[in-house]
């Protein structure tokens, strides 16, 4: 059959195709006619960006349909989306994509309607109309996907003056959203609010359901003294994370902030300051941790194991890993040992190339398994 492809310059190209052709095939035909490399092409139909591995019939593209061709700015990149079940999805995006576009891609891959998706990055809920670049989301960033439960509820917020405020919320609302609602009602800026429930200070990027806050629960609102400060946390990879904290924060709160930024569960974190391991129930001021102090983060291995990585030169590297480590994590460990950037690494096991977002256990890689490392030539696929 014939279909049409319209470019941004207004030119229309006619292509001979079959319903069973993949989008990849169509891009190759466009390359033959127009000389545009497939990796610079984005095809749009009915407002949706078409994925390479799908067919025309998957998108119900019929004879004489018109596709729109948009040139991919060189800002094409991959990002990861982590669900609460721990599954990681890889998406091809551009810095100029809106959050709405990203949710549509997640719907294509996972079938979750956009209105049930909430995307979180660096502890912030992302708004549909903003772009990835607005939030400084760069290649290989990880977003967190939280499902929006249907059906609202009421909760109460009690202030130190004894006043009680009633709020309409959803279990999937973040603490940040709740603070914004309090600001709407009471005029108190979110950065001066601290919310306490069951004796715990609530972190902005977490949801009410994360804290098991249910209908008619009561939160306590404490005004934040201007004593906020920044501290640094240095990881074994040499990365330094900056955290906004207060001297009265517990070590548990600090670990929760690290989880929000880096996705590392608190029970796998050990924090060291002045040579001492810090205990969850103590506060920063208990340890005399002051502004711009640096803590050291050591990961606690759970049921760790060793695996081997064999290079083409015949060298074998030993790595300490966990079954739950992603291939991305493994490549980072190889980078730490060998200095090879992750984007130049291809890992092979049992004849299969391993995908970044999957875990070792997904591939049934067990202790003392051997992976093979092949270097990706630059500019190669």
Swiss-Prot record:
It comes from the Eukaryota. Residues 381 form a propeptide. Pfam families: ubiquitin. There is a cross-link at residue 76 (Glycyl lysine isopeptide (Gly-Lys) (interchain with K-? in acceptor proteins)). There is a cross-link at residue 48 (Glycyl lysine isopeptide (Lys-Gly) (interchain with G-Cter in ubiquitin)). GO terms for cellular component: cytoplasm; nucleus. Residues 1-76, 77-152, 153-228, 229-304, 305-380 form the Ubiquitin-like domain. Its main location: cytoplasm. It is found in: Cytoplasm; Nucleus. The keyword Cytoplasm applies. Ubiquitin is generally synthesized as a polyubiquitin precursor. Some ubiquitin genes contain a single copy of ubiquitin fused to a ribosomal protein. Ubiquitin exists either covalently attached to another protein, or free (unanchored). When covalently bound, it is conjugated to target proteins via an isopeptide bond either as a monomer (monoubiquitin), a polymer linked via different Lys residues of the ubiquitin (polyubiquitin chains) or a linear polymer linked via the initiator Met of the ubiquitin (linear polyubiquitin chains). Polyubiquitin chains, when attached to a target protein, have different functions depending on the Lys residue of the ubiquitin that is linked: Lys-48-linked is involved in protein degradation via the proteasome. This is Polyubiquitin. The lineage of its organism: Eukaryota, Sar, Alveolata, Ciliophora, Intramacronucleata.
């Amino acid at each position: 059959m014939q279909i049409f492809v319209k470019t941004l310059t207004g030119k229309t190209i006619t292509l001979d195709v079959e319903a069973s052709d993949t989008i990849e095939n169509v891009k190759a035909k466009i390359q033959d006619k127009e000389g545009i490399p497939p990796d610079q092409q984005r095809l749009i139909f009915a407002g949706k960006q078409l994925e390479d591995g799908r067919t025309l019939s998957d998108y119900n593209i019929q004879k004489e349909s018109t596709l729109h061709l948009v040139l991919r700015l060189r800002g094409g990149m991959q990002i990861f989306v982590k669900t609460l079940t721990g599954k990681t999805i890889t998406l091809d995006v551009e810095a100029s994509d809106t959050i709405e576009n990203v949710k549509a891609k997640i719907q294509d891959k996972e079938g979750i309607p956009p209105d049930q998706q909430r995307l979180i990055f660096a502890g912030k809920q992302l708004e549909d109309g903003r772009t990835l670049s607005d939030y400084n989301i760069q290649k290989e960033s990880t977003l967190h996907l939280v499902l929006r439960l249907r059906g609202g509820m009421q909760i109460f917020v009690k202030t130190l003056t004894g006043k009680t405020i009633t709020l309409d919320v959803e279990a999937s609302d973040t603490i940040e959203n709740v603070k914004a609602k309090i600001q709407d009602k009471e005029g108190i800026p979110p950065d001066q609010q601290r919310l306490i429930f069951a004796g715990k200070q609530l972190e902005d990027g977490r949801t009410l359901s994360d804290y098991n806050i249910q209908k008619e629960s009561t939160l306590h609102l404490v005004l934040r003294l201007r004593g906020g400060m920044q501290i640094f946390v240095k990881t074994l990879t040499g990365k330094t994370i900056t955290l906004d904290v207060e001297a009265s924060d517990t070590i548990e709160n600090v670990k929760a902030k690290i989880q929000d930024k880096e996705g590392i569960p608190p029970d796998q974190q050990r924090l060291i300051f002045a040579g001492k391991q810090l205990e969850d129930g103590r506060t920063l001021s208990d340890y005399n941790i002051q502004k711009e102090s640096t803590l050291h983060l050591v990961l606690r291995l759970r049921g760790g194991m060793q695996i081997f990585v064999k290079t083409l030169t015949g060298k074998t590297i030993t790595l300490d890993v966990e079954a739950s480590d992603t291939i991305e994590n493994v490549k980072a460990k190889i980078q730490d040992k060998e200095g090879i950037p992750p984007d130049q690494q291809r890992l092979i096991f049992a004849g299969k190339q391993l995908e970044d977002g999957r875990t070792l256990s997904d591939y049934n890689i067990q202790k003392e398994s051997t992976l093979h490392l092949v270097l990706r030539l630059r500019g190669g696929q």
